[in-house]
């Protein structure tokens, strides 16, 4: 999982920085004028839009499938019914812990991916502008996130809304399709596919809606 998310951070950090500056239109004339604002825009896009979306998509693709598969197997093998017969609170034991774990892991993976993406972006920028000081990168990259007097970076609440909302949507989709009646392995596989499609659709709606409200 860590490698999975780290790769996403590496790709976002490199691609957004390299291709923005490498193929900047009329770079010889505009780069000296727009360099700092462009770097601030890259930091804004990475931290506020791209990384939360990438983390949510990777969570849906991996964890959503795992949840649906695990619960589908339990239902097919009558393990859920056995828990009910034994008086074990399966809603707390399974459903609550799954949702809590998804939200916490989503937040942790977002923070980790943001750090990796920023570091890769810095190294990529340093490769493109070897004669410039890294102080310029730090000042410009985070400038759009540190405006204001708050303790947290600007827009933290919106990022939390996207990540937490997406994690909850992934969890509910996995629980819904995973706990549905399963009579065969085909039903389990169908539940996995339905969980992934539904969770990805929901998180795209959540990110779009929050971004429209935010901006």
Which residues make up each language-model segment?
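Membrane-interfacial helix-loop-helix connectors in multipass membrane proteins
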Residues: 18-47, 112-164, 172-191, 214
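Bilayer-spanning, highly hydrophobic alpha-helical transmembrane segments
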Residues: 103, 107-120, 167-173, 201-209
């Amino acid at each position: 999982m860590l490698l999975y998310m780290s790769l996403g951070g590496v790709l976002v950090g490199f691609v957004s920085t390299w291709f923005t500056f490498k193929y900047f239109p009329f770079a010889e004339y505009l780069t000296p004028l727009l360099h700092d604002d462009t770097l601030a825009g890259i930091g804004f896009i990475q931290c506020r839009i791209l990384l939360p979306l990438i983390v949510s998509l990777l969570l849906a693709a991996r964890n959503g499938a795992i949840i649906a598969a695990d619960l589908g197997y339990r239902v097919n093998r009558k393990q859920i019914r056995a828990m009910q017969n034994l008086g074990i609170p399966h809603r707390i034991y399974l459903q609550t812990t799954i949702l809590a774990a998804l939200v916490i892991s989503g937040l942790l993976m977002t923070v980790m991916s943001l750090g990796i993406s920023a570091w890769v972006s810095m190294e990529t920028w340093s490769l493109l502008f070897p004669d410039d000081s890294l102080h310029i990168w730090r000042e410009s990259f985070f400038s759009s996130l540190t405006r204001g007097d708050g303790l947290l970076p600007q827009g933290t609440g919106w990022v939390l809304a996207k990540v937490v909302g997406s994690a909850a949507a992934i969890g509910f989709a996995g629980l819904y399709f995973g706990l549905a009646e399963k009579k065969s392995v085909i039903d389990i596989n169908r539940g996995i596919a339905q969980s992934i499609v539904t969770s990805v659709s929901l998180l795209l709606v959540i990110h779009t809606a929050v971004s429209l409200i935010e901006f």
